[in-house]
């Protein structure tokens, strides 16, 4: 099993990409009739307790530089929403600064071949760059598969409760390639292969649960 090394040479991921996200209300049938305040209030555990799917809002994603959206980039010269936005993550969703999943709608283009844009804040990580550094190091290890990453400077304009608004600086995020069929194909592996999601990933001993196979209580 080998990664597609050439994939990491297509784009320069050493700098910072600027993204502009305008959020607005959608409709009940698509679960997008919510406020931006609601999106940032509830954690994954709150949704489980309420027994509802994670709230979403409509989003207009535009990519550019610090001067604004750029021609040729996704969302340029676009007025209508081209995406949906919701929180992502599990434990991290309890932080005040959320991680976001921005999913571009069908026929609304893609960004670097990706329609799902995962933006991670890493609020619990003081330096904010260790995750990207880890993926950058993985690129040099032939025996490991990696994911594409990019630092993102995010600006958000909230129109969910007002017809007017200004872009607010949300600071630095790390965009991490969403591991799905599109990513599997891009990395040169079987897009129909099986993906498994780990529900619990920790390094604690749990002596009352983790036992040797020779233990009678195994």
Model-derived regions, located:
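Phosphate/dinucleotide-binding and metal-coordinating scaffold of catalytic cores
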Residues: 1-218
């Amino acid at each position: 099993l080998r990664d597609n090394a050439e994939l990491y040479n297509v784009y320069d991921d050493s700098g910072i990409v600027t993204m502009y996200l305008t959020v607005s209300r959608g409709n009940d049938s698509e679960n997008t009739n919510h406020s931006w305040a609601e999106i940032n209030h509830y954690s994954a555990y709150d949704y489980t307790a309420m027994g509802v799917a994670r709230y979403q809002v409509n989003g207009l994603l535009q990519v550019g530089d610090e001067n604004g959206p750029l021609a040729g980039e996704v969302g340029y010269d676009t007025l209508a929403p081209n995406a949906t936005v919701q929180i992502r993550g599990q434990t991290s969703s309890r932080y005040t600064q959320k991680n976001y999943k921005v999913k571009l709608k069908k026929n609304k283009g893609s960004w670097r071949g990706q329609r799902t844009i995962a933006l991670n804040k890493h609020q619990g990580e003081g330096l904010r760059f260790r995750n990207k550094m880890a993926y950058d190091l993985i690129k040099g290890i032939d025996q490991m598969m990696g994911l594409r990453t990019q630092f993102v400077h995010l600006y958000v304009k909230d129109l969910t409760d007002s017809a007017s608004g200004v872009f607010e600086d949300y600071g630095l995020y790390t965009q991490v390639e969403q591991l799905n069929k599109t990513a599997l194909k891009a990395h040169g592996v079987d897009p129909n292969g099986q993906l498994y999601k780990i529900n619990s990933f920790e390094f604690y001993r749990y002596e009352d649960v983790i036992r040797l196979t020779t233990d009678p209580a195994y």
